[in-house]
Amino acid sequence: MKVTLPDFRQAGVLVVGDVMLDRYWYGPTSRISPEAPVPVVKVDTIEERPGGAANVAMNIAALGAGSRLVGLTGVDDAARALNAKLGEVNVKCDFVSVPTHPTITKLRVLSRNQQLIRLDFEEGFEGIDPQPIIERIQQALPEIGALVLSDYAKGALAHVQTMIQTAKAAGVPVLIDPKGTDFSRYRGATLLTPNLSEFEAVAGRSKTEEELVERGMQLVADYELSALLITRSEQGMTLLQPGKAPLHLPTLAQEVYDVTGAGDTVIGVLAAALAAGNSLEEACFLANAAAGVVVGKLGTSTVTPIELENAIRGRADTGFGVMTEEQLKHAVELARQRGEKIVMTNGCFDILHAGHVSYLANARKLGDRLIVAVNSDASTKRLKGPTRPVNPLPQRMIVLGALEAVDWVVPFEEDTPQRLIASILPDILVKGGDYQPHEIAGSEEVWANGGEVKVLNFEDGCSTTNIINMIKASTSQS
Protein backbone atom coordinates (compact mmCIF):
# COMPACT_ATOMS: atom_id res chain seq x y z
CA MET A 1 0.00 0.00 0.00
CA LYS A 2 1.43 3.35 -1.06
CA VAL A 3 0.48 6.07 1.43
CA THR A 4 1.66 9.66 1.57
CA LEU A 5 1.36 11.87 4.61
CA PRO A 6 -1.70 14.15 4.38
CA ASP A 7 -1.76 17.83 5.27
CA PHE A 8 -2.84 17.40 8.87
CA ARG A 9 -3.23 21.16 9.24
CA GLN A 10 -6.51 20.85 7.33
CA ALA A 11 -7.91 18.37 9.87
CA GLY A 12 -10.01 19.11 12.94
CA VAL A 13 -10.69 16.49 15.62
CA LEU A 14 -12.66 16.57 18.86
CA VAL A 15 -11.61 14.19 21.64
CA VAL A 16 -14.08 13.42 24.42
CA GLY A 17 -13.27 11.10 27.27
CA ASP A 18 -11.51 10.39 30.53
CA VAL A 19 -8.69 12.87 31.01
CA MET A 20 -5.94 12.33 33.54
CA LEU A 21 -2.56 13.62 34.60
CA ASP A 22 0.44 11.27 34.47
CA ARG A 23 3.13 12.15 37.00
CA TYR A 24 6.62 10.64 36.88
CA TRP A 25 9.14 10.68 39.71
CA TYR A 26 12.65 9.66 38.66
CA GLY A 27 15.75 8.99 40.71
CA PRO A 28 18.60 6.58 41.47
CA THR A 29 18.25 3.56 43.74
CA SER A 30 21.25 2.34 45.72
CA ARG A 31 19.87 0.75 48.90
CA ILE A 32 16.96 -1.08 50.52
CA SER A 33 14.80 0.68 53.10
CA PRO A 34 15.43 -0.37 56.74
CA GLU A 35 11.66 -0.03 57.32
CA ALA A 36 10.57 -2.63 54.73
CA PRO A 37 12.11 -4.76 51.95
CA VAL A 38 11.62 -2.07 49.31
CA PRO A 39 14.11 0.08 47.36
CA VAL A 40 14.73 3.68 48.37
CA VAL A 41 14.48 6.09 45.43
CA LYS A 42 16.17 9.47 45.76
CA VAL A 43 13.87 11.56 43.58
CA ASP A 44 15.77 14.09 41.48
CA THR A 45 13.39 14.67 38.55
CA ILE A 46 9.63 15.21 38.41
CA GLU A 47 7.62 15.28 35.17
CA GLU A 48 3.94 15.84 34.44
CA ARG A 49 2.27 14.73 31.22
CA PRO A 50 -1.36 14.71 30.07
CA GLY A 51 -2.70 11.15 29.91
CA GLY A 52 -5.77 9.21 28.86
CA ALA A 53 -7.99 11.18 26.50
CA ALA A 54 -5.62 14.12 26.97
CA ASN A 55 -2.80 12.08 25.46
CA VAL A 56 -5.00 11.31 22.44
CA ALA A 57 -5.54 15.05 21.98
CA MET A 58 -1.80 15.66 22.28
CA ASN A 59 -1.06 13.07 19.62
CA ILE A 60 -3.47 14.81 17.27
CA ALA A 61 -1.97 18.22 17.98
CA ALA A 62 1.58 16.88 17.52
CA LEU A 63 0.67 16.08 13.91
CA GLY A 64 -0.33 19.70 13.34
CA ALA A 65 -4.08 19.00 13.27
CA GLY A 66 -6.65 21.08 15.11
CA SER A 67 -7.23 19.33 18.44
CA ARG A 68 -10.05 19.99 20.90
CA LEU A 69 -10.52 18.18 24.20
CA VAL A 70 -13.61 17.76 26.38
CA GLY A 71 -13.52 15.88 29.67
CA LEU A 72 -14.23 15.98 33.39
CA THR A 73 -11.75 17.37 35.93
CA GLY A 74 -11.72 18.55 39.48
CA VAL A 75 -10.95 22.08 40.58
CA ASP A 76 -7.38 21.49 41.73
CA ASP A 77 -3.68 21.76 40.91
CA ALA A 78 -3.84 18.71 38.63
CA ALA A 79 -6.56 20.33 36.49
CA ARG A 80 -4.54 23.53 36.26
CA ALA A 81 -1.45 21.53 35.29
CA LEU A 82 -3.44 19.77 32.55
CA ASN A 83 -4.71 23.05 31.14
CA ALA A 84 -1.22 24.54 31.13
CA LYS A 85 0.50 21.51 29.60
CA LEU A 86 -2.12 21.07 26.89
CA GLY A 87 -2.15 24.76 26.06
CA GLU A 88 1.59 24.60 25.41
CA VAL A 89 1.04 22.05 22.62
CA ASN A 90 -1.98 23.78 21.02
CA VAL A 91 -4.74 21.58 22.41
CA LYS A 92 -7.90 23.60 22.96
CA CYS A 93 -9.34 22.48 26.30
CA ASP A 94 -13.00 22.79 27.22
CA PHE A 95 -13.18 20.87 30.49
CA VAL A 96 -16.26 20.42 32.63
CA SER A 97 -15.14 21.19 36.18
CA VAL A 98 -16.59 19.07 39.00
CA PRO A 99 -15.71 20.62 42.40
CA THR A 100 -16.67 17.46 44.33
CA HIS A 101 -14.13 15.22 42.54
CA PRO A 102 -10.34 15.23 42.15
CA THR A 103 -8.74 15.26 38.72
CA ILE A 104 -7.66 11.71 37.93
CA THR A 105 -3.91 11.44 38.55
CA LYS A 106 -1.52 8.52 38.13
CA LEU A 107 1.90 8.71 39.77
CA ARG A 108 4.70 6.44 38.57
CA VAL A 109 8.02 6.05 40.39
CA LEU A 110 10.93 5.02 38.16
CA SER A 111 14.59 4.23 38.66
CA ARG A 112 17.07 3.25 35.95
CA ASN A 113 14.24 3.26 33.40
CA GLN A 114 12.30 0.67 35.42
CA GLN A 115 8.87 1.41 36.88
CA LEU A 116 8.81 0.45 40.56
CA ILE A 117 5.26 1.40 41.57
CA ARG A 118 2.18 3.26 40.35
CA LEU A 119 -0.17 5.19 42.63
CA ASP A 120 -3.65 6.21 41.42
CA PHE A 121 -5.56 9.21 42.77
CA GLU A 122 -9.12 9.12 41.48
CA GLU A 123 -12.83 8.96 42.17
CA GLY A 124 -15.16 7.86 39.39
CA PHE A 125 -17.25 10.51 37.63
CA GLU A 126 -20.29 8.24 37.25
CA GLY A 127 -23.52 10.07 37.96
CA ILE A 128 -22.28 13.45 36.73
CA ASP A 129 -24.77 15.33 34.51
CA PRO A 130 -23.81 14.52 30.89
CA GLN A 131 -25.53 17.54 29.34
CA PRO A 132 -22.53 19.92 29.49
CA ILE A 133 -20.45 17.39 27.53
CA ILE A 134 -23.22 16.78 24.97
CA GLU A 135 -23.55 20.53 24.42
CA ARG A 136 -19.82 20.88 23.83
CA ILE A 137 -19.95 18.09 21.24
CA GLN A 138 -22.85 19.75 19.43
CA GLN A 139 -20.99 23.07 19.32
CA ALA A 140 -17.85 21.49 17.84
CA LEU A 141 -19.44 19.23 15.19
CA PRO A 142 -19.57 21.82 12.36
CA GLU A 143 -15.81 22.36 12.62
CA ILE A 144 -14.43 18.82 12.94
CA GLY A 145 -13.82 15.87 10.63
CA ALA A 146 -13.78 13.16 13.31
CA LEU A 147 -14.90 12.53 16.89
CA VAL A 148 -12.79 10.37 19.20
CA LEU A 149 -14.36 8.86 22.32
CA SER A 150 -11.56 7.73 24.64
CA ASP A 151 -12.98 5.40 27.27
CA TYR A 152 -11.03 4.53 30.42
CA ALA A 153 -14.21 3.64 32.36
CA LYS A 154 -13.89 6.65 34.66
CA GLY A 155 -17.34 8.07 33.94
CA ALA A 156 -16.89 10.74 31.27
CA LEU A 157 -18.51 8.46 28.67
CA ALA A 158 -21.33 7.15 30.85
CA HIS A 159 -23.78 8.36 28.18
CA VAL A 160 -21.69 7.29 25.19
CA GLN A 161 -24.66 6.20 23.06
CA THR A 162 -26.06 9.74 23.04
CA MET A 163 -22.68 11.03 21.91
CA ILE A 164 -22.47 8.49 19.07
CA GLN A 165 -25.92 9.31 17.76
CA THR A 166 -25.31 13.06 18.01
CA ALA A 167 -22.17 12.81 15.85
CA LYS A 168 -23.70 10.35 13.36
CA ALA A 169 -26.64 12.68 12.81
CA ALA A 170 -24.14 15.35 11.76
CA GLY A 171 -22.26 12.95 9.45
CA VAL A 172 -19.11 12.94 11.59
CA PRO A 173 -17.28 9.58 11.98
CA VAL A 174 -16.99 8.29 15.55
CA LEU A 175 -13.85 6.42 16.61
CA ILE A 176 -13.84 4.71 20.00
CA ASP A 177 -11.05 3.23 22.11
CA PRO A 178 -13.25 0.85 24.16
CA LYS A 179 -13.07 -0.29 27.75
CA GLY A 180 -14.65 -3.29 29.44
CA THR A 181 -16.60 -6.19 27.97
CA ASP A 182 -19.89 -4.48 27.13
CA PHE A 183 -19.34 -3.45 23.51
CA SER A 184 -23.09 -2.97 23.09
CA ARG A 185 -22.53 0.47 24.62
CA TYR A 186 -20.73 1.45 21.40
CA ARG A 187 -23.43 0.26 18.98
CA GLY A 188 -23.40 2.19 15.71
CA ALA A 189 -19.86 3.58 16.03
CA THR A 190 -17.75 4.06 12.91
CA LEU A 191 -14.72 2.26 14.32
CA LEU A 192 -13.73 0.44 17.51
CA THR A 193 -10.02 -0.04 18.29
CA PRO A 194 -9.70 -2.74 21.00
CA ASN A 195 -6.37 -4.35 21.71
CA LEU A 196 -6.17 -8.13 21.46
CA SER A 197 -6.87 -8.71 25.16
CA GLU A 198 -9.91 -6.43 25.08
CA PHE A 199 -11.16 -8.13 21.93
CA GLU A 200 -10.74 -11.64 23.34
CA ALA A 201 -12.47 -10.65 26.58
CA VAL A 202 -15.58 -9.97 24.49
CA ALA A 203 -15.28 -12.39 21.56
CA GLY A 204 -13.31 -15.23 23.16
CA ARG A 205 -9.81 -16.51 22.42
CA SER A 206 -9.07 -17.35 18.79
CA LYS A 207 -6.83 -20.29 17.91
CA THR A 208 -6.32 -19.29 14.27
CA GLU A 209 -6.33 -16.18 12.09
CA GLU A 210 -9.50 -17.40 10.42
CA GLU A 211 -11.24 -17.73 13.77
CA LEU A 212 -10.14 -14.25 14.83
CA VAL A 213 -11.54 -12.77 11.62
CA GLU A 214 -14.79 -14.72 12.00
CA ARG A 215 -15.28 -13.59 15.60
CA GLY A 216 -14.39 -10.02 14.71
CA MET A 217 -16.84 -9.87 11.83
CA GLN A 218 -19.53 -11.19 14.16
CA LEU A 219 -18.89 -8.26 16.51
CA VAL A 220 -19.11 -5.85 13.58
CA ALA A 221 -22.51 -7.28 12.67
CA ASP A 222 -23.82 -7.58 16.24
CA TYR A 223 -23.02 -3.99 17.17
CA GLU A 224 -23.65 -2.37 13.77
CA LEU A 225 -20.09 -1.10 13.43
CA SER A 226 -18.64 0.27 10.21
CA ALA A 227 -15.26 -1.27 11.07
CA LEU A 228 -13.22 -2.97 13.77
CA LEU A 229 -9.46 -2.49 14.21
CA ILE A 230 -7.79 -5.03 16.50
CA THR A 231 -4.35 -3.92 17.70
CA ARG A 232 -2.24 -7.00 18.32
CA SER A 233 1.09 -5.83 19.77
CA GLU A 234 3.98 -7.66 18.05
CA GLN A 235 1.52 -9.13 15.52
CA GLY A 236 0.54 -5.70 14.23
CA MET A 237 -3.08 -4.78 13.47
CA THR A 238 -6.09 -6.32 11.76
CA LEU A 239 -8.81 -4.19 10.14
CA LEU A 240 -12.21 -5.79 9.57
CA GLN A 241 -15.00 -4.22 7.49
CA PRO A 242 -18.27 -5.64 6.15
CA GLY A 243 -17.95 -6.84 2.58
CA LYS A 244 -14.17 -6.40 2.45
CA ALA A 245 -11.21 -8.73 2.88
CA PRO A 246 -9.36 -8.42 6.22
CA LEU A 247 -6.38 -6.07 6.17
CA HIS A 248 -3.42 -7.34 8.23
CA LEU A 249 -0.67 -4.81 8.98
CA PRO A 250 2.56 -6.21 10.51
CA THR A 251 4.19 -4.26 13.32
CA LEU A 252 6.86 -1.73 12.36
CA ALA A 253 8.32 -1.45 15.86
CA GLN A 254 12.11 -1.87 15.97
CA GLU A 255 12.46 -1.89 19.78
CA VAL A 256 9.82 -1.79 22.51
CA TYR A 257 10.63 0.23 25.62
CA ASP A 258 7.18 1.22 26.88
CA VAL A 259 3.65 0.56 25.59
CA THR A 260 2.14 3.28 27.80
CA GLY A 261 -0.25 5.35 25.69
CA ALA A 262 0.33 3.42 22.45
CA GLY A 263 -3.42 2.93 22.03
CA ASP A 264 -3.88 6.69 22.38
CA THR A 265 -1.39 7.24 19.57
CA VAL A 266 -3.16 4.76 17.30
CA ILE A 267 -6.61 6.30 17.63
CA GLY A 268 -5.22 9.85 17.50
CA VAL A 269 -3.43 9.25 14.20
CA LEU A 270 -6.43 7.36 12.83
CA ALA A 271 -8.75 10.27 13.56
CA ALA A 272 -6.39 12.94 12.24
CA ALA A 273 -5.79 11.00 9.02
CA LEU A 274 -9.51 10.43 8.42
CA ALA A 275 -10.26 14.08 9.12
CA ALA A 276 -7.49 15.03 6.66
CA GLY A 277 -9.11 12.99 3.89
CA ASN A 278 -7.36 9.60 4.01
CA SER A 279 -9.29 6.39 3.52
CA LEU A 280 -9.74 4.12 6.53
CA GLU A 281 -7.16 1.67 5.13
CA GLU A 282 -4.63 4.48 4.65
CA ALA A 283 -5.36 5.84 8.13
CA CYS A 284 -4.73 2.39 9.64
CA PHE A 285 -1.41 2.15 7.78
CA LEU A 286 -0.33 5.50 9.25
CA ALA A 287 -1.55 4.57 12.73
CA ASN A 288 0.38 1.30 12.60
CA ALA A 289 3.55 3.17 11.66
CA ALA A 290 2.98 5.68 14.47
CA ALA A 291 2.54 2.88 17.01
CA GLY A 292 5.89 1.43 15.94
CA VAL A 293 7.52 4.76 16.74
CA VAL A 294 5.83 5.52 20.05
CA VAL A 295 6.54 2.17 21.74
CA GLY A 296 10.23 2.95 21.26
CA LYS A 297 9.89 5.89 23.64
CA LEU A 298 9.66 5.87 27.43
CA GLY A 299 6.39 7.00 28.99
CA THR A 300 3.27 8.54 27.46
CA SER A 301 4.51 10.04 24.18
CA THR A 302 3.43 11.51 20.86
CA VAL A 303 4.60 11.20 17.25
CA THR A 304 5.60 14.10 15.00
CA PRO A 305 4.97 14.29 11.24
CA ILE A 306 8.71 13.90 10.61
CA GLU A 307 8.88 10.74 12.74
CA LEU A 308 5.80 9.38 10.99
CA GLU A 309 7.22 10.18 7.55
CA ASN A 310 10.46 8.44 8.47
CA ALA A 311 8.54 5.41 9.72
CA ILE A 312 6.39 4.96 6.61
CA ARG A 313 9.46 5.38 4.40
CA GLY A 314 11.40 2.79 6.41
CA ARG A 315 13.75 5.38 7.87
CA ALA A 316 12.85 5.33 11.55
CA ASP A 317 16.31 4.40 12.86
CA THR A 318 18.38 3.91 9.74
CA GLY A 319 20.42 7.11 9.33
CA PHE A 320 18.48 8.60 6.45
CA GLY A 321 17.79 5.26 4.85
CA VAL A 322 21.35 3.87 5.05
CA MET A 323 21.17 0.15 5.83
CA THR A 324 23.22 -3.00 6.04
CA GLU A 325 22.24 -5.85 3.75
CA GLU A 326 20.52 -7.72 6.58
CA GLN A 327 18.57 -4.63 7.67
CA LEU A 328 17.52 -4.10 4.07
CA LYS A 329 16.24 -7.67 3.72
CA HIS A 330 14.06 -7.18 6.79
CA ALA A 331 12.74 -3.82 5.56
CA VAL A 332 11.94 -5.26 2.13
CA GLU A 333 10.11 -8.19 3.72
CA LEU A 334 7.90 -5.81 5.72
CA ALA A 335 7.25 -3.67 2.65
CA ARG A 336 6.22 -6.71 0.64
CA GLN A 337 3.82 -7.77 3.39
CA ARG A 338 2.14 -4.41 2.86
CA GLY A 339 1.86 -5.09 -0.87
CA GLU A 340 4.50 -2.52 -1.90
CA LYS A 341 6.46 -2.80 -5.17
CA ILE A 342 10.25 -2.71 -4.76
CA VAL A 343 12.46 -0.87 -7.29
CA MET A 344 16.26 -1.20 -7.20
CA THR A 345 19.09 0.58 -8.96
CA ASN A 346 22.82 0.96 -8.42
CA GLY A 347 25.84 3.11 -9.15
CA CYS A 348 28.83 4.98 -7.73
CA PHE A 349 27.01 8.34 -7.38
CA ASP A 350 30.32 10.02 -6.63
CA ILE A 351 29.38 13.66 -7.20
CA LEU A 352 25.60 13.84 -7.10
CA HIS A 353 24.20 16.10 -9.84
CA ALA A 354 20.87 17.04 -11.44
CA GLY A 355 21.00 14.07 -13.81
CA HIS A 356 21.26 11.66 -10.88
CA VAL A 357 18.39 13.33 -9.02
CA SER A 358 16.12 13.27 -12.08
CA TYR A 359 16.99 9.63 -12.81
CA LEU A 360 16.29 8.51 -9.23
CA ALA A 361 12.98 10.39 -9.16
CA ASN A 362 11.90 8.62 -12.36
CA ALA A 363 13.00 5.26 -10.98
CA ARG A 364 10.96 5.79 -7.81
CA LYS A 365 7.84 6.46 -9.88
CA LEU A 366 7.96 2.87 -11.14
CA GLY A 367 7.04 1.47 -7.71
CA ASP A 368 6.49 2.17 -4.03
CA ARG A 369 10.03 1.82 -2.64
CA LEU A 370 13.43 2.62 -4.16
CA ILE A 371 16.66 0.89 -3.14
CA VAL A 372 19.95 2.45 -4.23
CA ALA A 373 22.95 0.09 -4.06
CA VAL A 374 26.23 2.05 -3.94
CA ASN A 375 29.72 0.89 -4.93
CA SER A 376 32.20 0.91 -2.07
CA ASP A 377 35.29 3.12 -2.29
CA ALA A 378 37.45 0.17 -3.38
CA SER A 379 34.90 -0.89 -5.99
CA THR A 380 34.62 2.67 -7.32
CA LYS A 381 38.40 2.96 -7.56
CA ARG A 382 38.60 -0.25 -9.59
CA LEU A 383 35.88 0.94 -11.97
CA LYS A 384 36.69 4.65 -12.26
CA GLY A 385 40.43 4.90 -11.65
CA PRO A 386 42.88 5.75 -8.85
CA THR A 387 41.60 9.32 -8.31
CA ARG A 388 38.06 8.21 -7.56
CA PRO A 389 35.89 8.41 -5.62
CA VAL A 390 35.99 12.11 -4.84
CA ASN A 391 33.52 11.61 -1.99
CA PRO A 392 33.95 8.65 0.40
CA LEU A 393 31.22 6.05 0.72
CA PRO A 394 29.63 7.32 3.98
CA GLN A 395 29.16 10.80 2.50
CA ARG A 396 27.77 9.45 -0.76
CA MET A 397 25.24 7.29 1.08
CA ILE A 398 24.09 10.08 3.41
CA VAL A 399 23.44 12.43 0.48
CA LEU A 400 21.52 9.75 -1.42
CA GLY A 401 19.50 8.83 1.65
CA ALA A 402 18.40 12.42 2.10
CA LEU A 403 16.72 12.50 -1.33
CA GLU A 404 12.92 12.39 -1.33
CA ALA A 405 12.88 9.68 -4.01
CA VAL A 406 15.20 7.29 -2.15
CA ASP A 407 13.96 4.95 0.57
CA TRP A 408 16.97 2.76 1.30
CA VAL A 409 20.70 2.95 0.55
CA VAL A 410 22.97 -0.09 0.83
CA PRO A 411 26.68 -0.50 -0.01
CA PHE A 412 28.32 -3.37 -1.89
CA GLU A 413 31.99 -4.31 -2.28
CA GLU A 414 31.97 -6.19 -5.60
CA ASP A 415 32.40 -4.64 -9.03
CA THR A 416 28.74 -5.38 -9.77
CA PRO A 417 25.73 -5.74 -7.43
CA GLN A 418 24.70 -9.08 -8.96
CA ARG A 419 24.97 -11.01 -5.69
CA LEU A 420 23.08 -8.30 -3.78
CA ILE A 421 20.34 -8.12 -6.42
CA ALA A 422 19.98 -11.91 -6.35
CA SER A 423 19.58 -11.68 -2.58
CA ILE A 424 16.98 -8.89 -2.61
CA LEU A 425 15.17 -9.82 -5.87
CA PRO A 426 13.43 -6.49 -6.51
CA ASP A 427 10.19 -6.34 -8.46
CA ILE A 428 11.81 -3.89 -10.90
CA LEU A 429 15.54 -3.54 -11.61
CA VAL A 430 16.49 -0.20 -13.17
CA LYS A 431 19.70 1.05 -14.78
CA GLY A 432 20.46 4.34 -16.45
CA GLY A 433 22.35 4.79 -19.72
CA ASP A 434 22.71 2.97 -23.04
CA TYR A 435 22.51 -0.59 -21.71
CA GLN A 436 20.45 -3.39 -23.18
CA PRO A 437 18.36 -5.04 -20.43
CA HIS A 438 20.22 -8.36 -20.74
CA GLU A 439 23.54 -6.56 -20.13
CA ILE A 440 22.49 -5.32 -16.69
CA ALA A 441 23.96 -7.15 -13.70
CA GLY A 442 21.27 -9.12 -11.89
CA SER A 443 18.80 -9.05 -14.78
CA GLU A 444 18.70 -12.83 -15.21
CA GLU A 445 17.93 -13.35 -11.52
CA VAL A 446 15.17 -10.72 -11.53
CA TRP A 447 13.57 -12.15 -14.68
CA ALA A 448 13.72 -15.67 -13.24
CA ASN A 449 11.80 -14.39 -10.21
CA GLY A 450 9.09 -12.84 -12.37
CA GLY A 451 10.38 -9.27 -12.10
CA GLU A 452 11.02 -6.56 -14.68
CA VAL A 453 14.24 -4.92 -15.94
CA LYS A 454 14.08 -1.37 -17.28
CA VAL A 455 16.57 1.11 -18.75
CA LEU A 456 16.05 4.83 -18.10
CA ASN A 457 17.77 7.70 -19.87
CA PHE A 458 20.14 10.05 -18.08
CA GLU A 459 19.65 13.79 -18.44
CA ASP A 460 21.81 15.14 -21.28
CA GLY A 461 24.86 17.18 -20.34
CA CYS A 462 25.13 15.88 -16.78
CA SER A 463 28.03 13.67 -15.76
CA THR A 464 30.42 13.38 -12.84
CA THR A 465 33.40 13.28 -15.21
CA ASN A 466 32.37 16.59 -16.82
CA ILE A 467 32.00 18.21 -13.41
CA ILE A 468 35.46 17.02 -12.34
CA ASN A 469 37.01 18.26 -15.60
CA MET A 470 35.35 21.66 -15.20
CA ILE A 471 36.68 21.95 -11.65
CA LYS A 472 40.19 21.00 -12.82
CA ALA A 473 40.02 23.54 -15.66
CA SER A 474 38.82 26.27 -13.34
CA THR A 475 41.58 25.48 -10.84
CA SER A 476 44.33 25.52 -13.49
CA GLN A 477 43.16 28.89 -14.83
CA SER A 478 43.24 30.46 -11.40
Swiss-Prot record:
Gene3D superfamilies: 3.40.1190.20, HUPs. Residues 1-318 are annotated as: Ribokinase. The keyword Nucleotidyltransferase applies. Coiled coil: none annotated. It comes from the Bacteria. GO terms for molecular function: ATP binding; heptose 7-phosphate kinase activity; heptose-1-phosphate adenylyltransferase activity; phosphotransferase activity, alcohol group as acceptor. Keywords: ATP-binding, Carbohydrate metabolism, Kinase, Multifunctional enzyme, Nucleotide-binding, Nucleotidyltransferase, Transferase. Residues 344-478 are annotated as: Cytidylyltransferase. Its EC number is 2.7.1.167, 2.7.7.70. The keyword Transit peptide does not apply. It is an enzyme of class 2 (transferase). CDD domains: RfaE_like. The active site is at D264. InterPro entries: Bifunc_HldE, Carboh/pur_kinase_PfkB_CS, Cyt_trans-like, PfkB_dom, RfaE_dom_I, RfaE_dom_II, Ribokinase-like, Rossmann-like_a/b/a_fold. It catalyses: D-glycero-beta-D-manno-heptose 7-phosphate + ATP = D-glycero-beta-D-manno-heptose 1,7-bisphosphate + ADP + H(+); D-glycero-beta-D-manno-heptose 1-phosphate + ATP + H(+) = ADP-D-glycero-beta-D-manno-heptose + diphosphate. HAMAP family: HldE. NCBIfam families: cyt_tran_rel, PRK11316.1, rfaE_dom_I, rfaE_dom_II. Homodimer. Catalyzes the ADP transfer from ATP to D-glycero-beta-D-manno-heptose 1-phosphate, yielding ADP-D-glycero-beta-D-manno-heptose. This is Bifunctional protein HldE. It comes from Pectobacterium atrosepticum (strain SCRI 1043 / ATCC BAA-672).
